[in-house]
């Protein structure tokens, strides 16, 4: 099995000065890298991830307990400032997924458990915050 690239290598490859448009082939790769490096592979099942133009947000985590197939869904914007911003947003939504799936919290909020991942994000050169501009 081929080795996956590290997040640092991908950030360097795409750079911080060009726009990044995610696609459905790259997202699972970045998801696996973040899952391994931040969550120690605890997020076994990847939720459904949608890409669409959004107003007022760059990402969104949704939970629907009544859904038959996909009760967890991450929606991300279709265009980002750069690859780093995309990785931060995907990681941010993965923290909400972790809160719901692993910690079994009723609401995936920006609380103490959410910010407990800040050091892990910083180690990867990413920023974990409540609002991204």
Feature annotation, model-predicted:
Residues 1-88, 97-133:
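Active-site-proximal or metal-binding-adjacent scaffold patches in catalytic folds
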């Amino acid at each position: 099995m081929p080795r996956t690239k590290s997040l640092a290598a991908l950030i360097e490859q795409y750079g911080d000065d060009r726009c990044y448009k995610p696609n459905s082939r790259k997202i699972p790769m970045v998801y696996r890298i973040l899952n391994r490096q931040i969550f120690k592979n605890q997020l076994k099942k990847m939720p459904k991830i949608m890409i669409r133009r959004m107003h007022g947000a760059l990402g969104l985590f949704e939970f629907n307990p009544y859904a038959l197939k996909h009760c967890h869904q991450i929606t991300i914007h279709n265009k980002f400032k750069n690859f780093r911003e995309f990785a931060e947003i995907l990681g941010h939504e993965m923290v909400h997924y972790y809160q719901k799936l692993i910690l079994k919290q009723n609401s995936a909020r920006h609380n103490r458990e959410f910010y407990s991942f800040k050091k892990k994000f910083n180690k990867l050169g990413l920023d974990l915050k409540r609002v991204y501009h």
